[in-house]
Amino acid sequence: IGPGGKASNQAISARKLGASTTLSTRLGNDNFNSYAHDIWRREKLFASTTIDKNLPTGMAGIFIDHKTGENSVIVDPGASAHLSIDDFYSQKSKMKKGDIFLTQFEQSSDTTFAVLKEARELGMITIFNPAPFGKISRKAYQFCEIITPNETEAEQLTNISLKGKRDVEKAINKIRDLGVEKVIITLGKKGAAFFDGENISFCPGNNFGKV
C-alpha cells in the first residue's frame, strides 16, 4: 500500500516544479487520512480537506500485466465521491484569472460540471481528466479548455475504436465538436496525441523499463 491518486500525485508534482498549489479533497476519518496529511506536509503541499465521518478515504487497486506493462485500476472513491461545489467555494477567494484548475471524475458528475463551470467563468485554465470515466452533461465540455483522456476513455467518450492514427484523429475531432479547445489523448506505450488549438500532432512513447 502506498500514497497516490491522480489528484495528489499531480498536485505534488506541480508543487515540486515550483508552482503554488492547493489540493482540495475529501477524506475519511481513518488512518489513511493521517497518512495522506503526513505526505502532503512533507511535500509542503497545502491541502484543503473535508473529513467525512461516514465514509472511508478513497482507495484504488492497480493491477499490472507484467508481460505488457499495461495496467488496470479498480477504484473505490469513498469520501472523495462526495466532494461538492461547497469544497470549491471554500477556496474560491484564492483563485484568479489565469490560474490552472484541474479536476477529474472521482466526484459526482454534477460536482464536476459545477466546478468546471465556476472555474471557467473565473477565467481559469481548466483541465479535465475524465477518469475514471463516467457520463456527464454535454454542456460540461464547453467549460474544458484542455481534456486529457487515455486511450480507453477516449473510446468511451467518442464511441470510436482507436486502432490507428486516423482513428485517433477522428476521436480528437469528435471531442473538439463537444466544445473542448485542446485535447491530449495518452496512448500508453504508443505515446500521446494532442490537438493544440490548430494542429493534431503525435508524440512517440519512450520505454524506460520497470519503474
Q: Whereabouts are the PLM-identified features?
A:
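Short beta-strand scaffold segments in enzyme catalytic cores
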Residues: 12, 59-63, 72, 191-195
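Substrate-binding N-lobe of the ribokinase-like
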Residues: 1-59
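Conserved phosphate-binding/catalytic loop of the ribokinase/pfkB sugar-kinase fold
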Residues: 51-52, 62-100, 105
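Anion (oxyanion) recognition and catalysis
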Residues: 15, 41, 120-121, 176
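Conserved phosphate-binding/catalytic region of the ribokinase-like
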Residues: 135-139, 165-211
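Conserved beta-alpha-beta core of the PfkB/ribokinase-like small-molecule kinase fold
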Residues: 100-170, 190-192
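Short gly/ser/thr-rich secondary-structure transition/capping motifs
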Residues: 44, 81-86, 126-133, 205
